[in-house]
Amino acid sequence: MRLADARVAIEGVNLEIDGGRFAAKVVAGWEVAVEADIFCDGHDSIDAAVLHRQRGTDDWTEVRMEFLVNDRWQARVTFAENAFHELTFLAWRDLYTTWRKEVAKKLAAGQKIDLELEEGRRLLQSVETAGAEDRALVDRILGEDGADQEAGARFARMSSPEAVAAMKRCAPRTNLTCYKILPIFADREAAAFSAWYEMMPRSQSGDPERHGTFDDVIRKLPYVRDLGFDVLYFTPIHPIGRVNRKGRNNSLTPGPDDPGSPYAIGSEEGGHDAIHPELGDFESFGRLVEAAHAHGLEVALDFAIQCAPDHPWIREHPEWFDWRPDGTIKFAENPPKKYEDIVNVHFYRGALPELWYALRDVVLFWVEKGVKIFRVDNPHTKPFPFWEWMIGEVQSQHPDVIFLAEAFTRPKVMKRLGKVGYGQSYSYFTWRNTKAELIDYLTELTTEECRHYMRPNFFANTPDINPVYLQHSGRAGFRVRLALAATLGGNYGLYNGYEICEATPVPGKEEYFNSEKYQLRAWDFDQPGHIQDDIRLMNHIRRTHPAMRDFTRLRFYDAHNDSVLAYGKSTEDKQDFLLFHVNLDPHAAQTFEF
């Protein structure tokens, strides 16, 4: 397009991420507001349209835009398929509407409009793409028009609602401007709206002396579904290394029966594409996935790119790892912390491209086993280019695969992970406890540009994080954080033990004492004081109210008490609206005015 042709300006596109470098995220089947600033020099009227299509197809779907205010235009668009899409804009000078508005003003002022009516005839004659009905309508208007007729009647005929509609469909698009093509990815709904329940399969036997199996997990499925969850997330299920194995409470002196951390992946039994033999085999895993689906649950797996020192890859591909000057392999560190049972891979030098292919193939392997959701451990410590490539490779074949970024790191890093392809992200919700903190953070997530590429998943706790708030708040605090997590966000999650208000900490730390990361546990979820009914209620509200699905519909309201958070959610048509008042003080009742 020549510079002189770009007379109509198109800018400020809401679904344009970094100039089109990254795809904005939408949900397949959900209507989305597509907006842009569109304007022209002078006072001429303009018109605009959005064009969209599924990537790889030829035909565009056109949706006309509507003027909002201050040169802002909007179209309501639905991307039907879970797939990659493309989006662009057209804008042009609307000479017919300009003529109609100007002549109406002159007629109202009593001015002669004979020449203007002739100009109107010529505009009507200029229709280019009219169908048979529109062509017949225009011909009839022109045929009924005559210079001897009263000017007002002639203008009324030329500007009738039928004429306006026909000209909107088929009038020439003068000074047509086309915007660049932007990428869009339409996720399936579970990327934006899901309730996760996290467990360690090895602790599901009911006996702290017996390693759990997939069959034990199958017996727990009715319980998880009865609570109202739809995603069942497992920590790593692979063989656990024996070299430098950790003991209870992360000790360096394990006992002979200590199971080790499931994040120390790999042993002589296999690596990331193998199953811990005490859990079961691929046949029993397949039965588990099938049984979960029958209960309305999806299985999510932990994808942790790290290896135990006895992982087969270290022997088979030493070039994928870092080695110290004395010839020993370098274990993972985050000074002053050390992770003696874990070795990190190196993504460049001799590891490129074979390691990248191997990791992609691990994900595809589990996809073929029926897993379509992956929680990724510490993605912020791996290269952004790898994630962009790997997620793109997987979703080009399986667009229904969802990746959750377990990244508790700097804001810009978390947002970059969303841009490169992650459908969900852990968030700072875990540490936002006061009214001001929650309002500020949720306002950022729901109103700023990041809402188009970063979807938070509000986990109230994790195996690694025993929040200080929960350590000191008792049962009431667990109910508070449950209500906030389940109703503020579209995605939220609980790690098992939450329902019995488990909060015993390692003194002075946000960690669980006797964490099942390092030992088998047996849980009694029916013990006195449990909050199962609260969880069921929250998930029932989420399932039965359409307003709960889109977290960007969140709005905060006045409650004149710093311990009371007031907020609501509604559907676009306001047919479903929920108002929440949450007492953030777990120790005392509160009153408020609003």
From Swiss-Prot:
Residues the record marks as site: Transition state stabilizer: 464
SUPFAM superfamilies: (Trans)glycosidases (SSF51445)
Record-listed E.C. numbers: 2.4.99.16
Catalytic function, reaction form: alpha-maltose 1-phosphate + [(1->4)-alpha-D-glucosyl](n) = [(1->4)-alpha-D-glucosyl](n+2) + phosphate
Residues holding alpha-maltose 1-phosphate: 246, 306, 341, 378, 517-518
UniProt entry tagged with the keyword Transferase: yes
Active site residues of this protein: 377 (nucleophile), 406 (proton donor)
InterPro entries in the record: GlgE, GlgE_dom_N/S, Glyco_hydro_13_cat_dom, Glyco_hydro_b, Glycoside_hydrolase_SF, Ig-like_fold
Top-level taxon in the UniProt lineage: Bacteria
GO MF annotation: an example: glycosyltransferase activity
Similarity remark: Belongs to the glycosyl hydrolase 13 family. GlgE subfamily.
Description of how the protein assembles with itself and partners: Homodimer.
Name of this chain's protein: Alpha-1,4-glucan:maltose-1-phosphate maltosyltransferase
Source species: Cereibacter sphaeroides (Rhodobacter sphaeroides)
Gene name per UniProt: glgE
